[in-house]
C-alpha cells in the first residue's frame, strides 16, 4: 500500500478533504462513521499530522461520493 510521505502532500490532501467535508455539510464524526474511522483520525488526516494510505483515502472519497481524482 502506498503512503503519502511528505508533509506538504499530507497538508494539501488534508485541506482538500476538510474542504470537501465542509461543503458536504458533514462533521468529522459523521465522515468518520461513513468510512469506518474515528473522529480523531479524520482530524489528524485533515491537519496533515497523519499519513493516509490509498485504501483509507479511497474510503474517505467514497464516503463523500467522490473518486480518488479529487487528490
What would you call each of these model-derived segments?
Residues 2-3, 47, 59:
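Alpha-helical transmission elements in cytosolic ATPase-linked domains
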Residues 1-12:
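A detector for short, charged/polar N-terminal pre-domain segments
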Amino acid at each position: 500500500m502506498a503512503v503519502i510521505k511528505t508533509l506538504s502532500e499530507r497538508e494539501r490532501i488534508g485541506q482538500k478533504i476538510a474542504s470537501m467535508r465542509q461543503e458536504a455539510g458533514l462533521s468529522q464524526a459523521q465522515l468518520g462513521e461513513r468510512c469506518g474511522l474515528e473522529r480523531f483520525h479524520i482530524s489528524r488526516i485533515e491537519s496533515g499530522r497523519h499519513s493516509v494510505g490509498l485504501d483509507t483515502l479511497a474510503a474517505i472519497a467514497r464516503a463523500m461520493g467522490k473518486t480518488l481524482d479529487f487528490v
